[in-house]
Curated annotation (Swiss-Prot):
Keyword presence, Magnesium: no
Family: Belongs to the ATPase e subunit family.
Species this chain originates from: Bos taurus
Official protein name in the record: ATP synthase F(0) complex subunit e, mitochondrial
Keywords: Acetylation, ATP synthesis, CF(0), Hydrogen ion transport, Ion transport, Membrane, Mitochondrion, Mitochondrion inner membrane, Transport
């Protein structure tokens, strides 16, 4: 097995700095996008309720048209 290579402290500092900055950016971005996604999900749920209600009404009307006395 190959022995580990000595890495410059400056390179280590750069790597860990980039890691920390990436994590900080990700947390900030997540906090920015989370409320927007919640709003989109809420609107999608409202639209789904409206579509389901409309389909239910259409289905009831279709059944009422089929169930006439003059069959």
């Amino acid at each position: 097995m190959v022995p580990p290579v000595q890495v410059s402290p400056l390179i280590k500092l750069g790597r860990y700095s980039a890691l920390f900055l990436g994590m900080a950016y990700g947390a900030k971005r997540y906090n920015y996008l989370k409320p927007r996604a919640e709003e989109e999900r809420r609107l999608a749920a409202e639209e789904k309720k409206k579509r389901d209600e409309q389909k239910r009404i259409e289905r009831e009307l279709a059944e009422a048209q089929e169930d006439t006395i003059l069959k």
